[in-house]
Swiss-Prot record:
CDD domains reported in the protein's UniProt record: CYP503A1-like
Protein name as catalogued: Cytochrome P450 monooxygenase fsoD
Cell compartment(s), UniProt: Membrane
Entry-linked Pfam families: p450
Species, as recorded: Humicola fuscoatra
Pathway: Secondary metabolite biosynthesis; terpenoid biosynthesis
Binding site residues for heme: C490
Length: 547
């Protein structure tokens, strides 16, 4: 009898805890934001918050723009639920500068990364301490991609030339005037990923093209698995994240082990080569592997850490692949796809492609120009075209998200003294701001030279007429948030813009491109804009001297 009673109590407790968990998932607590802050997307219906959250999976653009037009444009914050049933307060544009200046002791991105980026559930690597290693990688990538960016231009040019010609067509096509229809997103994947690997892993990825291709395939599969897992787990309610992550980690662990099996010997080989030739100035001595080793040695000499071996550096590269590597390559692929689609579908009377081609011919007259930073700084038209495409197609429709971590909450600088309680998520309605007619007339249209025209108009009013002061594509403002804003803006944005300029310049100088139909409308999964997977263009090798 005692055993039966104990079993009954145990079963009852099990179902009680399970029922509580399910109810918590289906009926999440109402937001504790002040009552005067409006909530967008929640209807008067059964399971209202759950259903509003589910709608955000595919209908996020409509809900965000509706909330922005009703509240954001009137300089009022509003609340939106994401697909995981997490409420987030979205700030009006006049609060963005103040928001970005708040210290990490008040607003932190740590908790957001743990949940929305699924770091808490997907991080692997027992010998890697997450936070300190993340700071180290951020410093190393900042140093590599920003301070020494010009040193990368030669190898970038070499890889862009090799990859574009491989994907777009051979020299023989110049003889028969052959047009080739390609899937643009797939083509950009085949371009951008090898370029990223060339920068971070160096040229010596294998002894043959076949081995190099095998290395790239393994690494690419890991990145895809990590990226899909991050988005999928990040959009789930907290109740389900841990459970589903246990299943997702199984294939992820397999791809991770395959990649490490390839990476560790590669790292060991390059470190050994570096030790035998400390004065090597060629590309083998400039890759990210050596850069990590050098920074590790400096830290060891200063007493702040121990020197990293091949296994640990391989882990660092895996972390880079899972954060900057995946985010950088995937976002650049989407940006490049959208940019070319926008340009080939620009009204022909604007002569956008012709003007960009002439600018590339003027700034890149020989191979030496490709290695000089000044050449691409002079490409104001390309800069404007890239900036305009990022404005129209931001990677995230809302962003800059942080969590209030101060116990007393955070008081907004508004007339109503709105206080946001601890634990709340706060962000910015990026797409709403980017499509605000107050900042961008005809905001729904792609106008490739919008920013040079604005700069030229401003200079004309001041007595000038040049567009040299047009804002750079990599420079965020409170109304241009394609790369984030403030001290936490994307660290690789200058590198990304340089890569986009190189790809665009090389394509226009060596190929004709044309549209196969209207560009598809942007779709989203949660906060993330999806790439136009099926969009195609036609390409043809240009004949020497042709217009």
């Amino acid at each position: 009898m005692y055993d039966i009673t104990l079993a009954a109590v145990s079963i009852g407790l099990f179902f009680y805890v399970g029922a509580r968990a399910v109810l918590k998932c289906l009926f999440p607590r109402q937001t504790s934001f002040p009552k005067h802050v409006p909530v967008v997307g929640v209807r008067d219906e059964m399971l209202s918050i759950t259903r509003a959250s589910l709608r955000q999976l595919t209908n996020g653009i409509t809900t965000l723009l509706d909330g922005y037009s009703k509240h954001g444009q009137r300089n009022r914050p509003f609340v939106l639920y994401d697909p995981s049933a997490q409420p987030e307060l979205l700030l009006p544009v006049q609060h963005i500068r103040w928001f970005s200046e708040q210290p990490d002791s008040k607003l932190s991105s740590h908790g957001v990364r743990q949940e929305r980026h699924a770091v808490r559930y997907l991080h692997m690597g027992d010998q890697v301490e997450l936070e300190s290693t993340t700071r180290f990688i951020r410093y190393a990538s900042n140093d590599r991609l920003n301070r020494h960016l010009e040193n990368l231009q030669g190898l970038l040019h070499d890889e862009v030339r090799r990859s574009v010609d491989c994907v777009f067509g051979s020299q023989r096509q110049a003889q028969d005037d052959h047009w080739k229809e390609i899937n643009l997103y797939g083509a950009m994947q085949d371009l951008v990923f090898p370029i990223m690997c060339r920068v971070f892993l160096g040229k010596e990825l294998g002894e043959s093209d076949e081995e190099r291709g095998r290395v790239l395939t393994v690494f690419r599969r890991y990145l895809m698995a990590m990226g899909i897992s991050t988005i999928f787990i990040g959009e789930l309610p907290r109740l389900l994240k841990g459970v589903v992550a246990r299943v997702v980690r199984i294939p992820l662990a397999y791809y991770r082990s395959q990649t490490l099996r390839m990476l560790v010997p590669l790292v060991r080989s390059q470190l050994s080569r570096t030790k035998h030739d400390e004065d090597d100035d060629d590309e083998r001595g400039s890759d990210f592997i050596k850069h990590c080793a050098n920074l590790s040695t400096k830290s060891t000499l200063s007493g702040t850490s121990s020197e990293a071996g091949p296994d640990l550096i391989a882990e660092w590269i895996m972390m880079l692949a899972g954060s900057l590597g995946f985010a950088g390559s995937s976002s650049t692929i989407i940006q490049a796809t959208n940019l070319i689609l926008d340009l080939v579908n620009t009204p022909p009377e604007l002569l956008a492609l012709q003007q960009l081609r002439h600018e590339a011919e003027r700034t890149l007259q020989d191979d030496s120009n490709w290695t000089q930073a000044a050449s691409f700084r002079q490409q104001k038209l390309a800069d404007s075209a890239i900036r305009e495409s990022l404005r129209l197609h931001p990677i995230l429709i809302k962003g800059l998200t942080k969590e209030v971590v101060t116990p007393n909450g955070l008081e907004l600088p508004d007339d109503e003294n709105t206080t946001i309680p601890m634990g709340s998520w706060v962000g910015v309605p990026v797409l709403g701001i980017h499509q605000d007619e107050r900042f961008y007339p005809q905001a729904s249209e792609y106008r490739p030279f919008r920013f040079v025209e604005q700069a030229e108009a401003a200079r004309t009013q001041a007595g000038g007429g040049s567009y040299e002061d047009a804002p750079e594509a990599a420079k965020p403002t409170t109304t241009y948030l394609g790369f984030g804003y403030g001290r936490h803006a994307c660290p690789g944005r200058w590198f990304a813009v340089l890569m986009l300029k190189m790809i665009l310049s090389y394509v226009l100088l060596h190929y004709d491109v044309e549209s196969t139909g209207p560009a598809p409308k942007t779709r989203v999964l949660g906060d993330a804009a999806l790439p136009p997977f099926r969009a195609t263009i036609r390409v043809r090798k240009r004949k020497l001297g042709s217009e």
